[in-house]
Amino acid sequence: MDINEIREYLPHRYPFLLVDRVTEITLGETIVAYKNVSINEPFFNGHFPHHPIMPGVLIIEAMAQACGILGFKTVNKLPADGYVYYLVGSDNVRFKRPVMPGDQLRLEANVIRGKRGIWKFACRATVDGELACEAEIICAERKVA
């Protein structure tokens, strides 16, 4: 999926769209997506000016956005139809290495279970094959419009 198709499945826009490309997707099972981390990201102005590191909460958000794409595509729904995926929880979050400008963040999510619009995913974010973050992410699909 290129950025144009991603924008059909995620309501997020600059500066909060954190998925640049999807390279693999198996509906109801797994997704592999990428975030290219650039020094031009607005959060690097304050986190930290002399040692820029991507905030951990934004790594979690990037993984959650990949989960949202997988969920939306699996159930064949779109934000344009009035649906949204909320990040409602995260468990067992661990950060293993910093993510810095120039890194390409690989986002992997696997469905643990999904029932009545509540989804749980096992997620990993890696840089050059090295684990940066892992978490279980819970999302809720809701009709908002």
Swiss-Prot record:
It is an enzyme of class 4 (lyase). InterPro entries: FabA_FabZ (IPR013114), FabZ (IPR010084), HotDog_dom_sf (IPR029069). Gene3D superfamilies: Hotdog Thioesterase (3.10.129.10). GO terms for cellular component: cytoplasm; membrane. Keywords: Cytoplasm, Lipid A biosynthesis, Lipid biosynthesis, Lipid metabolism, Lyase. SUPFAM superfamilies: Thioesterase/thiol ester dehydrase-isomerase (SSF54637). The keyword Disulfide bond does not apply. It comes from the Bacteria. It catalyses: a (3R)-hydroxyacyl-[ACP] = a (2E)-enoyl-[ACP] + H2O. This is 3-hydroxyacyl-[acyl-carrier-protein] dehydratase FabZ. It comes from Chromohalobacter salexigens (strain ATCC BAA-138 / DSM 3043 / CIP 106854 / NCIMB 13768 / 1H11). The lineage of its organism: Bacteria, Pseudomonadati, Pseudomonadota, Gammaproteobacteria, Oceanospirillales. The gene is fabZ.
